[in-house]
């Protein structure tokens, strides 16, 4: 039985079946069969569990092993049985660095534990006494054959064999020798793992702590420090004037400052108050109608200042313990540079015009939605370039505008690319949608919603 498992272990491990030799099932946390990463944050402990069992009554053991983002395999963590009758084992992992981790569950047959259990059950009641001690002697032979032992170890083994096999001694005395601390200590240093089985690896991602929650405050830089003259002319607020508001934001306990789009605003089909299509010359339009002759998603609206002014704003916020979150709205005004350079990125209607955004009965004539199917690689490369530009200027949080209206592959590909080099970047999905879409947005990388 358990004495001979090692003879067949190598052969069994190379069999190709859907079921491991030691079945490992219902491993968690696993998202969509491992297609997506489970989530945790640095320093956050979470449970890994699995149903592990085998045929018959022989003993088994299992552990979970994590591999960190650098490819270093961490020390195994023993899994313990949770309750009786369900064969569920669990252990706790606590990632200590950000990035993409994996874990795997390992299980094996434990011939020593099997012998100890059978011996403790049978010998005291006089069942198979000599057979159990003989099988224990074979285990001693095996450990001598497979490992390099010290002289002290060999003495302990000889004494154990002599004591438990001495039929002139009382059975309980022989049992005490067989189960003695000294021999158990030797076995603990040289554990056997017969019939090894592995489930995984499965991915999990360790975010920084801010991914769990943040206290967000929103303001329009244009409104902070804006002035209206006696004649009614409005002078826009800037990053410099908006920075004066930062201490008050920090004093209220906020640690994330969200800015709506700070880019040039389209002039074609610009909206006025109450969604009118007849704006006054001084109406600035909707910040979400991104892009004009002054630039697109990679530019700062001239009314707000320069890119250097933005950098100074971010630095001042950071000194106060505030992170700046930028809006990521993948859409374009009719006069966005993309509309000229890459008209194929949009949907052309039967009359040759580019389709504007609609959410019946609402119409957004000042916004062109992007058609991600016409040139997916071109769009991906441009959006990734834009993201990395703002990341290089200190933005580590993006509030993604209406992500549920874009194909999920867009976020899967973009966020995966960002995490590969910058695992500290966070994405909040601003989505009002059905649970399946919300779950999918989380699966592809959005930490918040």
Predicted features by range, described:
Residues 8-55, 114-147:
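Non-catalytic, glycine-rich low-complexity segments
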Residues 55-94, 118:
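Aromatic-rich carbohydrate-binding modules that target alpha-glucans
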Residues 80-133, 140-195, 200:
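Extended acidic/polar, glycine-enriched regions
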Residues 190-212, 323, 345-357:
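N-terminal carbohydrate-binding accessory modules
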Residues 213-237, 265-312, 340-377:
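Aromatic- and acidic-residue-enriched carbohydrate-binding clefts of CAZyme catalytic domains
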Residues 215-217, 257-259, 324-326, 398, ...:
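Hydrophobic faces of well-ordered beta-strands that scaffold small-molecule active sites
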Residues 241-263, 389:
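Catalytic domains of carbohydrate-active enzymes, especially glycoside hydrolases
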Residues 401-449:
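Active-site-proximal helices and loops of the catalytic beta/alpha 8
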